[in-house]
Amino acid sequence: VHELASSERGAQLSIALERLTLLAGDFQRIGLSATVGTPKEVSSFLVGDRDVEILTPKLERNMDLLVHAPEPVSDDDELVNELYWEPERVAALRYSAKASEMGPTLLFVNTRDTAEAMGVRWNMWDPDASIHVHHGSLSKDVRIDAEEDYRKGTVNTLICTSSLELGIDVGNTALVLQYNSPRDASRMSQRLGRSGHKIKETAIGRIVSTEETQILESAVIARRTLSGELEPSRIREMPLAVLANQIISWTVCDKNVDKKMFLDTIKRAYPFRKFTEENLTDMLDLLDKVHQNRTIGKAVRQGPRAMKYFHGNLSLIPDQRTSGVRDITTRKMIGRLDERFILDLVPGDKIVFRGSVWAVVEIDDEVTVSPSASLGELPRWIGEDIPVPFSVAQEASQRLADGNWAGLPITREALDVLQSYHESIADAGVMPSPECLTVEQHERLFILNYPGGSRSVSYTHLRAHETFGY
């Protein structure tokens, strides 16, 4: 339930549940999660102002989590040239391969292109490697085959994104690896929980980081994960896109809807508990202007464009234009690529997909490919980076400013990297901290150092707009 609570999809669900009670009466609602930082608020999201009981199991899991910073070795030089990868990344790959010898391993990465980059280079390094790549842009059949092979033990390691973070039973997992920072403690806790999936078993995880800031952020998150300091779920307050979506959907389904029924039902949904009659009137007026509904007295009915919107916007998941990718040798669909990436392709180009290299044969309604040997271009997918909580960024910055590594679950090598990083910044001048924003000036570049987490992205956009007009 934590995945829904803070999103527009969750707000859509909350109104939909209230609409369902009009048809079926009140019913039992059960929300499951292992990583809720604010159980009381999330329970309110699920049931509104109804009575609710929060059940927390008394059994605590044993967790073994450590941050590693594998050091490049001289033997990696040839591999660096062969794989076209930085020494630190090659060292991380080598460590991951060695660690996975412990048993069935899930190697989590944060993006689909990182999964592909790791998968194809692992296969180039070791063609007999027992690995599969798993992410949401691969076809359903490919993902199911990967899960089945892992369950049966014919594949030892799955390189995966959040596609395997929740819900799916992949059987026994001895070790969870996380490549670079997991970005927040709730996500790391969820991923770590995939290992040791039996009562009294220890969940074992290792975060493999490749550079200083990743090591620092990973160490802070690992500490928070082990101490149970999970980020609070922030419920979106009255997202208007959701409100418009549900009003249009409702009028399409019920033809005529009483305005008071709209108001009373929507207010019962927790994200819209502060919803007012004035809010409703403003939204109905807006939808009327764009021909999505018509208000006649106290009733609201669908507008001339409502049906088209309804069928094109059932979900609030952003709709990205994609095309299928088919293996010409087997005629099987292996996944989907964003059209923006496909526009730059021509027959003969090499691309990386499913951890392997493919040559583009034909581009029509779908992309036809055949297996290839040489390294190709990584696909580009439109998506959002996983946000970094403000509290994580603040703690990381304060520890760096103080040179304080106490209580961080990291190896000696990782600690040495952090200490060296702290000393190099101190030698350069002013140390950035939560109280001190610093600016680095390079030849054609300014870097603002401020520990705002993902909030810094908003600040960057505002500064860019003020300075450059975009």
For the regions a protein language model found, what residue spans apply to each?
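Generic beta-strand/beta-sheet core signal
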Residues: L32, F108-N110, C160-T161, G171, ...
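Long, charged amphipathic helices and adjacent flexible linkers at domain junctions
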Residues: S233, M307-Y309, I425, P432
